[in-house]
């Protein structure tokens, strides 16, 4: 009987913890930002597309910024620098935990960098893919 009670207590505790961790009210600002892009029509994240976006040489934006890695590190874990030699923290969320948590900054930098690198504004789907890839790094 003791083992059954212990098992029942463990299962109940696991269920409570699971419910707490998946409660939308506990979602963080990054998840809220992704939810906003989902509301604009983005589907599930495609990490491979996010990686492809980070590494692709586009040639459709400004000539001096043909790809993300022109200013950001060759890998998301590396820092980079602007064309004026100002340091840029790594894009990987594992290295820069506050990355993609401020909606105003996310909107500003996607608008500026997508226009500069790709030559157009990124779609909601591209933003979800890009953010999700960098969260995974």
List each language-model region with its residue ranges.
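Short microdomains enriched in Cys/His and/or Lys/Arg
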Residues: 89-104
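Short cysteine/histidine-rich zinc-coordinating motifs and their immediately flanking basic loops
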Residues: 80-87
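C-terminal capping alpha-helices of c-type cytochrome domains
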Residues: 107-137
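Electrostatic cytochrome c docking/interface patches
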Residues: 28-62
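The canonical Cys-X-X-Cys-His
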Residues: 65-75, 130
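Bacterial N-terminal signal peptides
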Residues: 9-20
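Positively charged n-region of N-terminal signal peptides that target proteins for export
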Residues: 1-6
């Amino acid at each position: 009987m003791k083992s059954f009670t212990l098992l029942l207590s463990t299962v109940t505790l696991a269920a409570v913890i699971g419910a707490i961790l998946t409660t939308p009210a506990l979602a963080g600002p990054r998840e809220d930002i992704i939810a906003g892009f989902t509301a604009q029509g983005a589907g599930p994240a495609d990490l491979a597309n996010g990686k492809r976006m980070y590494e692709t040489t586009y040639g459709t934006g400004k000539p001096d910024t043909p790809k993300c890695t022109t200013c950001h590190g060759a890998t998301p874990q590396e820092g980079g620098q602007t064309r004026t030699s100002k340091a840029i923290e790594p894009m990987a969320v594992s290295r820069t935990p506050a990355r993609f948590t401020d909606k105003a900054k996310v909107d500003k930098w996607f608008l500026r960098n997508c226009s500069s690198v790709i030559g157009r504004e990124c779609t909601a789907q591209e933003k979800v893919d890009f953010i999700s890839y960098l969260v995974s790094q």
